[in-house]
A protein has these predicted regions:
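SAM-dependent transferase fold signal centered on methyltransferase-like domains
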Residues: 1-401
Length: 401
């Protein structure tokens, strides 16, 4: 039996169970188990790749760290809009981002220091229909040194070149790091040369990164993309250019029907209108901006965009008169409100034993308030504990739209 036959026969089985079975003659069991494990991850994360026959998958860590198909396609859309024809991916990895961004390029350079990943890329890229790819098994710093030393190539490509980096976010001890200068490579040391020899740089960073800090460190920021998938913030993508003007934010929530929200950097200083407490009545709509908008700090700009009022200057809950289709926010219809006077609260809570509790600008933790209210998680009732513009603490009962 060949490795390929074994994988095809067993790829939907549990690799841990397979590891306990007798190894058929001619089968490299360790390699096959890695392929089966990778395939099972790819079915959800990379469906197009999982459907291709004979794709090779890397070790589990590389599978976990690679972009999802959804976020890779989003970056592909950015490159198509920018119109570049030469791609240089200085941190190739498994090659998911590279494979999508390279599709419409005249030339695409894949740079990776791990030989095993370069071998996998050499095997996989033709299967994914990629042409005109150049694979370099070296460090990004060494490749860049050699590339810029070739003055003819560097000058020819400069105005049509996009450089992509996804710096490793683990240190030598395998611990996660989040600041740009702690990642490998350290883009802060390379950015001047990268900007000089390219039309654009695209930089993928951790969703945990402080965007304000990144704006201070990085040069030539043209675009900041805050990328969520199904409500969870997954990536920050910075587009840099020596010709950059005022940066623009792009807040997206992939695999949903929500609108994208685009705004200039200056909008982060906008102030939203404040709701009168009497407006928070039965039938009013509460809006909670999605993770991308919250991460970008564009809550107030979002409110201005949709003519919403803020419940309190320090709150990130907003009020409207009616539901809004495809808005990048969760929406809830107000059913009832209560202050925290003992008698009022007792009456308000008398039929509630289970609810989804959210704390916003309120002097308590979720766990402490759940104990006080004697409720369990779950169900179809949503409770918001918050503070109104007159500094009254309230509990708002809602139904999700």
């Amino acid at each position: 039996m060949t490795n390929e036959e074994f994988i095809k026969q067993h790829r939907n089985e549990n690799p841990l169970s397979l590891a306990l079975k007798k190894v058929p003659e001619g089968v490299d069991m360790q390699w096959c188990l890695r392929q089966i494990e990778g395939y099972n991850i790819a079915k959800k994360k990379l469906p197009e790749w999982s459907e291709k026959e004979n794709i090779w998958f890397p070790p589990k860590l590389s599978m976990e760290q690679c972009s999802s198909e959804a976020t890779a396609k989003y970056k592909q859309a950015i490159t198509e809009r920018l119109g570049n024809k030469v791609l240089i991916d200085l941190t190739g990895g498994f090659g998911i981002d590279f494979s999508y961004m390279a599709k419409n390029m005249e030339t695409a350079y894949y740079v990776e220091q791990q030989e095993v990943l370069c071998n996998i890329a050499s095997h996989n890229f033709p299967l994914m229909g990629l042409q005109n790819t150049k694979i370099s098994n070296t460090t990004c710093e060494e490749f860049w040194k050699q590339y810029t030393a070739d003055d003819t190539t560097a000058k020819t490509n400069r105005d049509k070149c996009l450089i992509y980096l996804d710096p490793a976010r683990r240190n030598d001890r395998g611990e996660k790091v989040f600041s740009i200068s702690d990642c490998t490579p350290d883009v802060t040391l390379l950015q001047d040369s990268l900007l000089e020899h390219s039309a654009y740089i695209m930089l993928k960073l951790s969703p945990m990164l402080d965007i304000v800090q990144a704006r201070r460190i990085l040069k030539g920021i043209a675009e900041i993309h805050v990328v969520s998938v199904k409500g969870e913030c997954k990536e920050l993508v910075f587009v840099m250019s020596k010709k950059a003007d005022e940066p623009h934010y792009y807040c997206v929530n992939l695999e949903t029907d929500e609108e994208s929200f685009t705004s200039p950097l200056s909008a982060t200083t906008e102030q939203a209108d404040i709701a009168d407490p009497v407006e928070i009545a039965e039938g009013a709509i509460i809006f909670e901006p999605n993770a991308s908008i919250m991460k970008a700090g564009l809550q107030n700009a979002f409110a201005k965009w949709k003519n919403l009022r803020k419940l309190h200057p320090m709150s990130n809950l907003f009020l409207g008169n009616k539901p809004i289709e495809n808005i990048p926010a969760r929406q809830f219809v107000v059913e009832q409100t209560s202050d925290f006077q003992k008698a009022n609260l007792k009456s308000f809570m008398q039929d509630i034993r289970q609810a989804n509790l959210t704390i916003r600008n309120f002097p308590s933790t979720v766990d402490d308030l759940k104990k006080r209210l004697k409720i369990k998680d779950g169900g179809d009732i949503y409770l918001f504990a918050t503070t109104l513009s007159d500094d009254t603490h309230v509990l708002i009962r809602c139904k999700k739209i």
